[in-house]
Structure formats: structure tokens, C-alpha cells
Amino acid sequence: MGIAVNWKIKRFEELSITELYEILRVRAEVFVVEQTCVYQDLDEKDKNAYHLFCEDNGNVTAYLRILDKGVSYPEISIGRVLTSQSGRRKGLGREMMNRAIEFVLENLKEKKIRISGQLYLKDFYESLGFETVSEVYLEDEIPHVEMLCGGCKHEI
């Protein structure tokens, strides 16, 4: 049986307590437990972001946040991109990124998006129109590159 796809995008203050709990739970599951990356997840940036996520029976299976201009970079940025173990290999990551790009271009009327992407996902982000704009650097002991999209490709 396939995944029941229910996409939502909300500002921090619009999230229900249950939605916020599920988002924080899956972020800890993926970034802290799976990637053994001990870091301060609650960084105040969530309050200045749109939260795009996919739910399946109340469980968050894919998530990212779209940060306002000036929060992390001069441009709008996308971060905390993840799919849960149960959501992987179903195309949710690509669909989610396409939805995020479309939202930024059409609703926020911004043309540039910056990300700090894990190096192993560089080809994936390039396929969406992002270009590498930095050398490789370590963020929480994981190789990353900064990438910028000035005319992202997106398909829903």
C-alpha cells in the first residue's frame, strides 16, 4: 500500500502542538539518532520560517523549513531537509523540494534560494537548479557545500 500524502505549509505560529511535536521528533530521529549529529536543533530560526511537511496518518514523513531572508543568509534559504525512514525511496524529497521552490517563487516572489546541503546530495540539488558556490566545509562533522539557485527548476 502506498503512502497517504498530505502536504502542509505553515508558519511557526500556525503549527499545532501535535504538528510541532512530530516535526521535532522526526528531526531528532533523522539528524541526531541516524546521523549521530549532536547539535542544538532548537535554534530560534523556526520562529522565522515556513514549515513544509508531509504527513501520513499523523506521522511526519518529509520535512523542511523555509527561512526568511536575513535569518541565515541574505537570501531566503531552505534547511533541515529530511525524509523519515518510512518516507524514503518514494520521491517525497524531490516533490517536497519542488513544492518549496514553487512556494518561494510564486508566493514569496523571491528568485534566489540558498541552501547548505550535505555533500552527498549535491547532484540531487543540482538537478533542481542549484549551483555550488562554496568549497566543501564541515558542519557538525558532516561535509557540506553552500548552493544557490537563481532560476530553480521545479515540477509538481
Model regions and ranges:
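A short beta-turn/loop motif at secondary-structure boundaries
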Residues: 42-47, 70, 138-139
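Conserved beta-strand in the GNAT
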Residues: 53, 59-69, 75-82
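Conserved GNAT acetyl-CoA-binding A-motif
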Residues: 97, 104-117
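Short amphipathic alpha-helix that is part of the acyltransferase structural core
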Residues: 2-51, 55-60, 156
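Conserved acetyl-CoA-binding loop-helix of GNAT-fold acetyltransferases
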Residues: 83, 89-102
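Conserved catalytic-core motifs of GNAT/GCN5-like acyltransferases
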Residues: 114, 126, 131-146
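Residue-level recognition of the GNAT/N-acetyltransferase active site
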Residues: 84-85, 116-118
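A conserved beta-turn-beta hairpin within the catalytic core of GNAT-like acetyltransferases
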Residues: 69-78, 88, 107-111, 141-143
